[in-house]
């Protein structure tokens, strides 16, 4: 009887060796977006928010990966993951943001856009915080019959995300998230710190 070869376990690396962000500005935008979205969905156990995590989309092929800067997936549990294995999660992200730059323009505008379309990512946004090349510097795409169509901008350059119910609006080097239903602005991390400091100061006076 012929020996049955042992199936080798395939390793899916947690890092692709690339820097997390092009600059401190790009990193800050990513961090603020992820933090704001995690806060928004903190009470919903089946909404996963992350960023800069390697997403593997072909089982058995560790080269088939992409690392979204910011992602939200509905219908999978919260929890820390080392990697995002699409065949195990069973769902693609529904919302992705790439904080783009002149260095990553070809990948963000072509390769990632085509891939996210194929993977069924419902909404894909690009934001160029340093105004390197993208005109306008916030752009969005939404799936329609399996193909991406541009999301029309408002007069102020903002875009509405149907998946999150948020308006995305450039503010200087930042990308503000605003609840479309209530008009509430999701705070950046430093704004939360400032508000806490203000409250502590007021409590100290009382």
Predicted regions: what they are:
Residues 1-22, 36-39, 55-68, 75-95, ...:
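C-terminal interaction segment
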Residues 43-55:
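A short acidic/basic microdomain associated with nuclease active sites
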Residues 48-50, 125-128:
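A structural signal for short, well-ordered beta-strand segments and their strand-loop junctions
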Residues 49, 70-72:
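Generic preference for hydrophobic
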Residues 122:
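Short acidic/polar active-site loop segments enriched in Thr and Asp
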